[in-house]
Amino acid sequence: GGDLGFTFSYFERAGEWPELLQKEVRFNGVKANLTGEVQLPLIESRQSVSLPVALSLAEKYRYRDGGAPVPGRRLLRFEPVSPDPLAYTGELEVDEASGRVLRERRERTDLPGTVKSEREILTYGEVAPGVWRPVAIRTFERWVTTGGVMQVQRRLTYRDFSLNSDHFLADLAGARASSATMLKVTPEGARYFTRQGDGSRKIEAEAKSSGRALAGVVLVDPGLTPPVAALPGLVYFDYNALGRGIQVNALTAGVFNTASAAIPRGLGSLDVSADASALLLKTTERPVQDGKLADADGVGRRFGKVGLGLGRDLGLGFRIEGRTDLEYDAYSEGATQYRTPGFVLPPSGLTRLGTLQGSWLFRGFQARGFYGWGKRPEGTYGTLSDPQSVPEGGDFRRWGGSLGLDREVQPGLWFHGEAGWVGGHAFDRFNALDVGGLGSAVHIAGIRSNAVSADQVAYAKTGLAIPTGPNLRLTVSLEHAEVRSLDNGRTYGLSGLGCTGDLPGFWWFTAVRVDLGVGVQSDIAGVTCLSGYVALLRVF
């Protein structure tokens, strides 16, 4: 996960829409190297026409007494008069003596966009004598993205209020005349307040939804040829393509390319997703034999794959999804030092996979389960002395599930815990459960990709996202798996340490991201390694 933070100067004058002057942008808590007017995408839930804020008693809502939670307080519960996915259900906590709203809790579900549901907590305070307004807002959201369903938290804090200041107009004029980024908060949501050629500013009709970045990526993987590769790349993303709520993400780096798209309610009530990727760098896959990584029987592999998925929210955080994937594997001779003379390569070709998945996400708790079935090309591979056949004519199955928890221990300090199990049937060396590499069934940091071939994997992970300051954001995870090897049916333990860090941008770059894994323990000799990437990004 990650977070995007902003610091604004907020200008509000009676009878006018509020204006915000962007002072700072933080990627994962680290200050980004941005100057001038740089507009990042705005992702918000659909706005409601009428909000039950501060006891406005809007006619679209029905109100009822919720009793006294503590002496001197009263709960006022509200719900929409008629069904409306954009309307809120919730409660206001009111001070009985003054009639002031102290706290507001509200939520919406089944929203028709990227944000599928949200739960908000608004805290009110007296910012000046007789002036009562929100001072803090926390929002918990469920998004449908190109990578699936994810949980997002927003936190807004208002402080250092200056009311009826003598220099308000001068400060506002200075903000408008500056070259910095500004926004206006309109009834339809936040819109960029763009500087024009004559020095004036204009409200953009639509919310900014797209962005681009140039990337310099260094890949580290001992299975690649070469094991360290520096790649230039271009990133493009849009959260409202064609104005229809379509999400698009794409990365092209020459030898590695990936793209994905998601269309909320793209087919009736079903969310549609699609993705494609291709790796043109050859990896050399070496088998595990008798509990250690072999220096023989190495096979080179390149691949490309596409996938299509359908999903539907069932309410209360439950969701069901189905997808189909097509992957083309091109096998060739591996690195020279790992080749075995006379080794027959496995059959290249198309592998088809269908998967059904159910999930539940609620207030940081996560549960997932899946069942998949597929077919790969038939054939044989190996040496004359030890020939191997693709089992069951290429038909195979896989299944598994996991439980997880994300919890903010204190502001900015996040805990993640996860445990799960994955299994299957009719696997072989070139179609099995892997625990290394980004595309593996279970990813354990610091384990070589496509080295361990297993038919059962049980795993557990724990991690902390540590707010170390504006110049560093550090996430550390400890990961362990117990795998049953196809080679001999024995179970082996593997452990790795993941380290993800964000650093402030420098020179021409906006931000720096480091994601590396180090293998710290393995019952299988030779499969631990240093792997991951370092990315330098320039947003424009």
Give the positions of each predicted feature.
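C-terminal outer-membrane beta-barrel translocator/porin domains of Gram-negative envelope proteins
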Residues: 28-61, 73, 195-218, 341-490, ...
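Outer-membrane beta-barrel translocator/channel fold
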Residues: 142-152, 272-313, 328-341, 512-534
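A short, structured loop/turn motif at beta-sheet edges
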Residues: 64-72, 94-100, 123-133, 467-469
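Structured extracytoplasmic
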Residues: 1-89, 97-100, 110-118, 142-197
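Transmembrane beta-strands of outer-membrane beta-barrel proteins
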Residues: 104-107, 137-138, 217-219, 249-253, ...
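Short, hydrophobic/aromatic-rich segments at coil-to-beta transitions
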Residues: 70-77, 100-105, 131-138, 212-213, ...
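Outer-membrane beta-barrel initiation region
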Residues: 147-275, 280-286, 313-321, 349-362, ...
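Extended lipid/amphipathic-ligand handling interfaces
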Residues: 8-10, 120-129, 263
